[in-house]
Amino acid sequence: MCNPSTTTTTTGSENQESRTGLFLDLFSINSFEPTKRNLRHCENRGSPLMAEAVTEAKSLFTLAFPIAVTALVLYLRSAVSMFFLGQLGDLELAAGSLAIAFANITGYSVLSGLALGMEPLCSQAFGAHRFKLLSLTLHRTVVFLLVCCVPISVLWFNVGKISVYLHQDPDIAKLAQTYLIFSLPDLLTNTLLHPIRIYLRAQGIIHPVTLASLSGAVFHLPANLFLVSYLRLGLTGVAVASSITNIFVVAFLVCYVWASGLHAPTWTDPTRDCFRGWAPLLRLAGPSCVSVCLEWWWYEIMIVLCGLLVNPRSTVAAMGVLIQTTSFLYVFPSSLSFAVSTRVGNELGANRPKTAKLTATVAIVFAAVTGIIAAAFAYSVRNAWGRIFTGDKEILQLTAAALPILGLCEIGNCPQTVGCGVVRGTARPSTAANVNLGAFYLVGMPVAVGLGFWAGIGFNGLWVGLLAAQISCAGLMMYVVGTTDWESEAKKAQTLTCAETVENDIIKAVVASTIDGECDEAEPLIRITVLY
């Protein structure tokens, strides 16, 4: 923790002392004093726990609702792209689906996971009133993601050869590569979009992102109509439309935030500091990426396993319908997860562990209720939901049989997703990664393969495997959250944000030369920030 004391020391002869001074300027935490006074005020006023919980619930809802709207808009945009691919023909739909799956596995999931490494840094720094750290972390993350785009781009340029090597149809593989090449601008815009969203969300600023997403959705449909239907660019037009839409979203978001001055309290111009001092970010980004990818990739593996079952055409199609369904239901717990991660990070950064614990508790209760509602929804629409996507009787039968299992999965998925958000807010992404690895691949995968193939249950056996994974993940995550030492996490938050500041100050420490001019007596020759 940063030492609150300040010490000034002089050295050298009297002649030297008259010209220069050597200052050991220890970092002060005076900026925390208002927070401490507020905390004492809250503790002394004796407000009931229920009233505090209601207040916290309102704060979470205020954050989560616009995030959910944004996610639903993105879901709608994806559906529009799939619609235009389907209108082009079976070959284009298959190639586009393969390209999107490859892009998700090798690109979008990776960038999304790596960007989440900045979330605890930004939310805790904002709570600790270390505003400069927010923009510095934003700059570093953008540079980091741009660097990561280089190997991803190489993969995308060679997806045709990779797909043929994996025994995919050569025509489908060639078209998939075309789609991905024209999606590269979209990949690059994500290196800006993800960090900006997190930078704003850490400050509780959500509405600009929602407005930008809504504007993008309005822009996306005419862009597809113009490029695909009018110019007849085919599959290439769908990819270009997605790229142009995201460029429009980023431009709208940046212009809106800049014009409204929302960036002003925490903004600093980019400097060479964004090219160094990456250690704290990398320590959080790596495990965050692993955690996201382990869960994201599971669903892609499920599609591959469906292709090995009897009548793969129907099982793969039914799995696609159900994954679209669970993606829709996932919008709500994931939005709550982002909200609770921000709130927990803010409170720990402000050194309010009791409030952080209350936030986590309220969010998990919300998640449990959300899971029950999702399960009831899945069960009630089991015989009708599939008709939105297809009229094939066999696909409809598979979908109707698996939807109740999907609903049970949501009872576990909602709490574990929100629990993962709590863990992210405490800057422990490696814990979430370990939980996902154990639950999905050491429990869920063996159960899915065993029931789906060895026991002969087939399609439903794969979904029972997912149910086992979600139950295990929820149980482990609740244990992690329940055993969290909140006082210790608050201290770690102070250390994390202070250590980042100290690292930058040490890097920038210089010895001032006084040969060419007089040095003001109040200006130190060396300024050193010390972390105890």
From Swiss-Prot:
The family note in this entry says: Belongs to the multi antimicrobial extrusion (MATE) (TC 2.A.66.1) family.
Q: What happens when the gene is disrupted?
A: Enhanced resistance to bacterial pathogen PstDC3000 in RNAi mutant.
Functional summary from the UniProt entry: Functions as a multidrug and toxin extrusion transporter that negatively regulates plant disease resistance. Plays an important role in maintaining normal plant architecture, possibly by regulating local auxin biosynthesis. May act as a negative regulator of hypocotyl cell elongation in the light.
Any one GO MF annotation of this record: antiporter activity
- Which Pfam families does this chain map to? MatE
Upper taxonomic classification of the species?
Eukaryota, Viridiplantae, Streptophyta, Embryophyta, Tracheophyta
The entry's localization annotation reads:
Endosome membrane; Late endosome membrane
Q: Which branch of life, at top level?
A: Eukaryota
The name under which this protein is listed is: Protein DETOXIFICATION 51
Q: Which GO terms describe its cellular component?
A: endosome membrane; late endosome; late endosome membrane
> Which GO BP terms apply?
defense response; negative regulation of defense response; regulation of auxin biosynthetic process; regulation of organ growth; root morphogenesis; xenobiotic detoxification by transmembrane export across the plasma membrane
Annotated transmembrane regions: 65-85, 98-118, 142-162, 176-196, 208-228, 238-258, 290-310, 316-336, 358-378, 395-415, 439-459, 461-481
Quote the InterPro entries the UniProt record gives.
MATE_euk, MATE_fam
Q: Which PANTHER family match?
A: MULTIDRUG RESISTANCE PROTEIN
Q: How does it sit in the membrane?
A: Multi-pass membrane protein
